[in-house]
């Protein structure tokens, strides 16, 4: 992304339509970064907690350059806890953590929060993840069972978000269900994972 620009979508995402909407949005609001933020992790709306499973940026995006620099120079050679300790030593951990759960695992989120607070001035085009990729999660109050019922055993009615993000617990046993044909025709799983 730093050198060539483009779109990064984590493999644990389900695309329900082409990514043309990203280009349309970019033309409308020329930002140096497009992505999603998670409101439930955000305490300070001026610094939304940006997710890293979807990123779109033009070549040379200052945000991507700064984020990569922070990650490669301060995070990657440390464990998650060591990076937390590093931020505590700087006196910024509680500020950048906001409501991020599992900060030792989500060190890339912390690194982005650190550069947003310490450098700033970036042009971001962010959408609330709870309204799109996590909409099905929100409808099921973030429970795995309600999400799997929506993915596997409910026919798609109406519009889906262009992207559905599956977290690690959401993916657990999903292949088991698909391999055994445990889904209904017309469901998200049937349309976008099996290709019926």
Residue spans of the language-model regions?
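A conserved donor-nucleotide-binding helix/loop in the catalytic core
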Residues: 1-9
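Glycosyltransferase-associated regions of secretory-pathway enzymes
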Residues: 11-196
């Amino acid at each position: 992304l730093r050198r060539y620009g483009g779109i990064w979508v984590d493999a644990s995402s389900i695309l329900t339509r082409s990514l043309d909407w990203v280009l349309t949005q970019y033309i409308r609001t020329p930002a140096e970064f497009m992505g999603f933020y998670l409101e439930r992790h955000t305490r300070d709306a001026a610094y939304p907690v940006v997710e890293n499973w979807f990123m779109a940026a033009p070549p040379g995006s200052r945000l991507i350059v700064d984020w990569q620099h922070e990650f490669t120079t301060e995070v990657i050679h440390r464990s998650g806890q060591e990076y937390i300790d590093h931020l505590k030593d700087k006196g910024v951990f509680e500020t950048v953590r906001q409501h991020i759960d599992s900060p030792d695992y989500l060190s890339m989120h912390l690194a982005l929060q650190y550069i947003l607070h310490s450098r700033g001035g970036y042009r971001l085009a962010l959408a609330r993840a709870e309204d799109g990729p996590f909409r099905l999660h929100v409808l099921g109050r973030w429970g795995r069972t309600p999400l799997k019922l929506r993915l596997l055993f409910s026919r798609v009615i109406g519009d889906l978000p262009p992207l559905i993000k599956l977290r690690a617990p959401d993916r657990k046993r999903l292949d088991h269900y698909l391999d055994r044909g445990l889904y209904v025709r017309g469901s998200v799983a049937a349309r976008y994972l099996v290709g019926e």
